Amino acid sequence: VIPDPLSGKEEQVTKLPNGLSVLILKDTRFPLVSTRLYVHAGSSYETPDQAGISHVLEHMVFKGTDSRPKSAISQEVESAGGYLNAATSYDYTVYITDMPDRHWKLGMDVVRDMAFHPTLDPQELESEKNVIVAELQRGEDDPGSRMFKTLLADTLKGTPYDRPIIGYEKTIRALTTQNLRDYIAKYYQPQNMLLVVVGNVDPAEVLAEAEKMFAPYKNTAPLKEVMPYEADRLPLPGSKPALVVQPGPWNKVYLAAALPVPGSSSYQSATLDVLAYLLGGDRTSLFYKTYKYEHQLVDSISVSNVSFERIGAFVVTAELDADKVEPFWTSLT
């Protein structure tokens, strides 16, 4: 049991015999229960030739499971007044339900079903590839998305974080259902998952139900430990600071500068979070007051510590007019 110093509540964390971690937090303020099933595998765990497979799998689980045909999953959740979603990040994939408290078991069962029993129909996969490629192309039309992808590709070059979560059209098109099944077998193991349940629940009842639902699942292979990258060795030896300019049909200039920093596994990450907030976290921050209000060089500016599991990037972004880029950059550097 872990006490939360901010809320005064206690979070109950239990590891089941098969290695599944279960975190339960009772919160009676609302008649709701949020359930999340985290899989410790995202785009940073992919091979270069299968870039985007985590995101493709996230899409495919909505196409049906062994016990719930296509569209039945969302219909079942929504008809009970709930919400269903999923998301892919660099370091994890998460399956999400928010339910009225009387239907919390359904929420847990649905995330279990999606993670462990997706149908993965080949025809559905080919159809969904078109949807994902269209999503990728829309991202290319968005200056912020395009800038962030380019920024990480250069700042974290030589690490798995230099690839976009969504992957590339070539790698997406090449994926097969067998690729997805192999990926599931490698990473979708209880020992590599965290089940989180928060809301108006009895923790003992939730734990008992989790043990019942997830006990049948066994681990299929040992997990390889991954080590953090040394931020002070990036960019890689021999490389030089990069300047990337990408023209586009926009009236403004979207500028970003970044350098590699330690990831979330380092104590320094919290220090960098504070520094980022002081420099450019909101309208009262140093950079915002200096470059937006005093010098009037930018329309907006922000600073963030983009922290991943094994590495991070300290990022300054700004939106400004083209004729103000040079004086802004000179002042910043």
Residue ranges and their predicted role:
Residues 1-45, 67-105, 138-192, 216-266, ...:
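Non-catalytic beta-strand/loop surface segments
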Residues 51-65:
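Active-site SXXK
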Residues 107-111, 126:
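Divalent-metal coordination cores built from histidine and acidic residues
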Residues 113-122, 212-221, 333:
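A common structural junction motif
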Residues 268-270:
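Zinc-dependent metallopeptidase catalytic helix centered on the HExxH motif
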